[in-house]
Amino acid sequence: MPRILSIDYGQKRTGIAVTDEMQIIASGLTTIPTHTLIDFLKDYFAKEKVEAVLIGEPKQMNGQPSESASVINGFVTHFSNIFPDMKVIRVDERFTSKMAFQTMLDSGLSKKQRQNKGLIDEISATIMLQDYLSSKRF
């Protein structure tokens, strides 16, 4: 069974998570500089079977798009032009950064480790993907 990849897109860094081949567990894959994202995805798709890509949809508390939504929507359009056969699934990414930080606290990471913004992005992508997998099962 092909994997599902999750992208927590940011202007500087992008967190990436992926499922196992059975699409049961989401695991953090990496955080990369955003300007290298398309090349990273080309390489990854050449090596691994991926059936869909989850991309966070930033929203405000009232459900309206956040200020960064236009940048991410631009990326989604660009992504779809480069990978026209790849299914894109948009998911609400509200609170994922806060949940990622809380996960880091609960894991006992040091203050210095918790300041690693790249790790927060990777954990955020993992949380989005695991939430999606959980919702798919019900």
Curated annotation (Swiss-Prot):
Xref: Gene3D superfamilies: YqgF/RNase H-like domain (3.30.420.140)
Subcellular location: Cytoplasm
SMART domains on file: YqgFc
EC number: 3.1.-.-
Hydrolase found in the keyword field: yes
Source superkingdom: Bacteria
Gene Ontology cellular component annotations, sorted alphabetically: cytosol
Transmembrane segments: none
GO biological process entries: rRNA 5'-end processing
Record keyword Mitochondrion present: no
GO molecular function terms listed in the Swiss-Prot or TrEMBL record: nuclease activity
Key words of the record: Cytoplasm, Hydrolase, Nuclease, Ribosome biogenesis
PANTHER family to which the protein is assigned, alphabetical: POLYNUCLEOTIDYL TRANSFERASE, RIBONUCLEASE H-LIKE SUPERFAMILY PROTEIN
Function: Could be a nuclease involved in processing of the 5'-end of pre-16S rRNA.
Family listed: Belongs to the YqgF nuclease family.
Protein name as it appears in the record: Putative pre-16S rRNA nuclease
Annotated organism of origin: Flavobacterium johnsoniae (strain ATCC 17061 / DSM 2064 / JCM 8514 / BCRC 14874 / CCUG 350202 / NBRC 14942 / NCIMB 11054 / UW101) (Cytophaga johnsonae)
